Swiss-Prot record:
The keyword Ribonucleoprotein does not apply. The chain crosses the membrane at residues 21-41. This is Uncharacterized protein DinQ. It is found in: Membrane. The keyword rRNA-binding does not apply. InterPro entries: DinQ-like. Its main location: membrane. The gene is dinQ. It is a single-pass membrane protein. Keywords: Membrane, Transmembrane, Transmembrane helix. Belongs to the DinQ family. One of its GO terms (cellular component) is membrane.
Amino acid sequence: MSKRMHSHSIAWRKRVIDKAIIVLGALIALLELIRFLLQLLN
């Protein structure tokens, strides 16, 4: 495995992790919003 390929795979993994964090954050925000709306209805 060449050095360039290795650094590329690390950058790719970091990008995937960043995307996963964004998706998780969006899901949590959505759940908070739903909980807030349910409280308003009750």
